[in-house]
Structures are given as C-alpha cells and as structure tokens.
Amino acid sequence: ISGTLVNPTNIVQTATYTVTPRANGCAGNTFTVVISVNPKPVIANVTHPAICSETAFTVTPTNGSGNIVPTGTTYAWTISNNSNITGASASSSTGISTISQTLNNTSNSPQTIVYTVTPTSGDTGNCVGNTFTITVVVNPKPLVMATTQTICSGTAFTATPTNGSGNIVPSTTTYTWTTPVSTPAGAITGGSAQTTGANTISQTLTNTTTEVATIEYTVTPISGACAGIPFTITVTVN
C-alpha cells in the first residue's frame, strides 16, 4: 500500500484507506490504514517595500493567499553578497518565527539584498518546505560631516556637499535648515531658515559689527523619504 499524499492545508489531515486483502481469488476481511499527513510550509517569494538605511525590515509569513504556514513555523536563511550593505547575516538558528534585520547602506545609491529562506513546520512534524526569497531594497540615508567657511561681509557662502571622504550624498539629496544662530547674538544679518528642500546651502551674510563674527547653520539632509542626521555649517564673517 503506497501513495504520495499532499496536504494543502496548514493543519494535520488524515487519510483513511479501507483495504481488502486477496489471495488466490479469496477475499479476506477488510482492514483500515490511517495516514496522518503533516502540513509542509509553502511560501511565495516576497518583495519587501524599500527601507531607509539603518532601519529594520520584518517579514512574518501568514497562512492564506496561496501560502501554507503551519502553526509554529520557523525559518533559517542565507543571504546574497552585497559589500555595500552591513547588518545582514545568515541564520541557521532554530526557533526564529520572523525574518528581521537592521540593514545599513554604506553607499550613495539604492542597494539590493536577497534572503533565501528555508521554512520548517514546528508544531506539526518538523516538515521542511521549499525555500523562498525575500528581496529588500535599502535606500541610502545622507550623511554629511560638519564644515566651516570664512567669507567677507556682504558676500555669500555656498556649501554643496559631495559624496566621499566620509560623506554619503545620494544624487537626490536636498537640504533644509533652521534659523541660524550668530555669535555675538545679532551680529550677522542675512541668515534665515529654509523649510523646503534646496540643492545647496547658500546665503549672503553681512557682519554689522567691527569684529569677526560667526553664524552656525543646523542642516538636515534628505534623500527621498530618508532623512539623515543634521549637521552643522559654521561660517566666519569678517
């Protein structure tokens, strides 16, 4: 008595065979064979919504919509190689019920990483399902170092951060800033806040005193939906 059985649900199912044995044309008493068929995880490939660098993605497969996810299913995975992404690591541990890691994009362009995941049913027989993939795009988050400049009164300073030398500057980066603070207070005019994204940081500044004065801008770099840590530009106005 042999056959290949498929359980299309996420719980244990039974199949009952009623068997009549025969020998030399003589039928014996029937008997039954009851087969318990444990479910095997079946999970479709996942394309995760893009995330910003330094944030986590989380995938917790659920039963339904073509997926078969038995109660207690756990996951192990390998990862594709991408030298521009840190924070991704393979996992062969048992008992992991979600796939989640915090990923960092060290470049200035979107990067992709692929997780190849093996699901195993936990509460229903430890049946190993076919692998599925999770594809995650990690968008870069701007990172700009603090800078200083010196100008003459009545002229403009301009700062246009570039990628490299510790900076991460995606091509779509724009900048906003709060009202700059001058030292001594009120010594410099021309500085104002920028509430909509600008491609450069530039303003014409006037030193109203007879002494050297400084003004500090606190700037937030933004690329798409990803905002970087604010940085400062300190301008000395002679």
Report the location of each language-model feature:
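Extracellular low-complexity Ser/Thr/Asn/Gly-rich intrinsically disordered segments
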Residues: 1-238
